Regions:
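Short loop/turn microsegments at loop-to-beta-strand junctions
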Residues: 38, 64, 144-146
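A short beta-strand-turn-helix
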Residues: 41-64
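Conserved helix-turn-beta segment immediately C-terminal to the redox Cys motif
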Residues: 82-101
Length: 181
């Protein structure tokens, strides 16, 4: 390698320190456990397709929140995961917990999915991925399959990354029970 090429490479090294980490550039970084969970304020659909209500983290203060991110409605994994949460939904009140889903799909598609699958929990629309990125769950143009358990004070207590949709709701319920002992 010639001296000029080496000097150019050495001169470029400080610029590498200025660029965001690959995780931050892609999906954001996972929020830290035992810290205040990132806030959100997103439009919802749910309870068999009701549209338009905006929900935020603080709406759930005083109870546990299961906030799950998923890539896209009407796909096999996302449908399986949503059905699992719906199947177990009657068990969440015993843990004083609410279930809320988040994806980049629009509210109309959420409403259609809720109606089609008989979902009785809200789905939030994050079309630009801003909230998904705050939770380290964004790879454009989709949210990744991550779940976060937030306590009644808004503190992040558990996170699940790259989940198995067929058993995930049961894993979340088990974790809620462990956290509440």
């Amino acid at each position: 390698m010639r001296r000029q090429e080496v000097l150019k490479l050495l001169g470029a090294l400080p610029l590498l320190a200025l660029r965001p980490s690959p995780a931050a550039a892609m999906g954001g970084t996972l929020p830290e456990l035992d810290q205040l969970a990132p806030d959100f304020n997103l439009e919802s659909a749910g309870q068999s397709g009701a549209l338009g209500q905006r929900l935020q983290r603080d709406d759930f203060r005083g109870s546990w929140l299961v906030l799950y991110f998923y890539p896209r409605e009407f796909t096999s994994g996302c449908t399986l995961e949503a059905r699992g949460f719906q199947r177990d939904l009657s068990l969440y009140p015993a843990a004083d917990a609410a279930v809320v889903g988040v994806s980049a799909d629009g509210s109309d598609k959420h409403a259609s999915f809720c109606t089609s699958e008989g979902l009785d929990f809200p789905l939030l629309s994050d079309p630009g991925g801003a909230v998904s990125k705050l939770y380290g769950a964004w790879i454009p143009p989709f949210s990744q399959r991550h779940t976060f358990v937030i306590d009644p004070d808004g503190i992040l207590r558990a996170r699940f990354v790259g989940v198995n949709p067929s058993v995930h709701s049961q894993e979340v319920l088990s974790t809620l029970q462990e956290l509440q002992v």
